[in-house]
């Protein structure tokens, strides 16, 4: 009888010994998530964060410059009220249609991870897991397409300064969604960073835009609602992307004792953009914008070649931007990703002053202060990340 009980007595301590460190590790990662929005990504990988920020700045700056160039050279001043919103589905499409460019780096990352670290591909073979991810990617793709169309419509309905003020509201909604969806709690440094980012976005109200409507074309009711819901959609988009990482991808790699791979960033962008592209193409065809594209190309003041280059350049630049934005969600959180996206607006506005001359736009005090608050906003968040990294060791 004693011999039969002996193996049972010996098997219990190993079970307790293995279980204790797992629980401690998860609890510690949850504590870090409550402070900065970071989960099991510990410590923060500064090279990845830095490269992602550079991608956001470069991608957003070039995309916005080419967008201004597109609207400035399509002679929109000659459009009547019925054609004011021409191209909104096209602009939404340009934000996602370049996703095939990410297939090559996606495959390279997968191959490298399998060869060097014997990691499984980012896409799991679990059918239940695949179905859940498929539903989430479809939802994210829908949000991406709707957000792109609403933002494009808002900029064509109201003055760009008003659009910017309303669109900045995304920074109010991102922390709210992050608290409910991602279970993030905020410390004072993150709150300070968000407040400074809101001020930065609001101070870019003096910026101009090539597709800005004339006074007779303004529709404040429709344009304001479009700008507001575009901001809400962007905040919801970022928080859902973080939910994909935290609830699916990171748990998947954690269960197999593997480190998260940046290939998952490309995975999220590619599948979500595929859905968004399909929706935008359908919307474009229903709205009849395919006929507008030919008319715009023929009437483009810089020629057909410049028109094609502007469109292709936007598609490529937006993919660079998305890699940076989703990379920041992957590395840190949806909140930092939104903060970085907004505080790069002053850089874009300064570049518009340099390359264009919309309504005698110039570098004024608002743009100068916006650049300062942008730096302070980033510094506040990075200071908190630095403290978290020190605590992690």
Curated annotation (Swiss-Prot):
It is found in: Cell membrane. Its main location: membrane. It comes from the Eukaryota. The keyword Transmembrane helix applies. Keywords: Acetylation, Cell membrane, Cytokinin signaling pathway, Membrane, Transmembrane, Transmembrane helix, Transport. The modification N-acetylalanine is found at residue 2. Expressed in seedlings, leaves, embryos, ovules, seeds and the root and shoot meristems. In heart-stage embryos, detected in cells that failed to respond to cytokinins, including the prospective cotyledons. GO terms for biological process: cytokinin transport; cytokinin-activated signaling pathway; negative regulation of cytokinin-activated signaling pathway; purine nucleobase transport. Purine permease implicated in ATP-dependent cytokinin translocation that controls the spatiotemporal landscape of cytokinin signaling. Depletes ligands from the apoplast, which leads to a suppression of the cytokinin response. Belongs to the purine permeases (TC 2.A.7.14) family. This is Purine permease 14. The lineage of its organism: Eukaryota, Viridiplantae, Streptophyta, Embryophyta, Tracheophyta. The gene is PUP14.
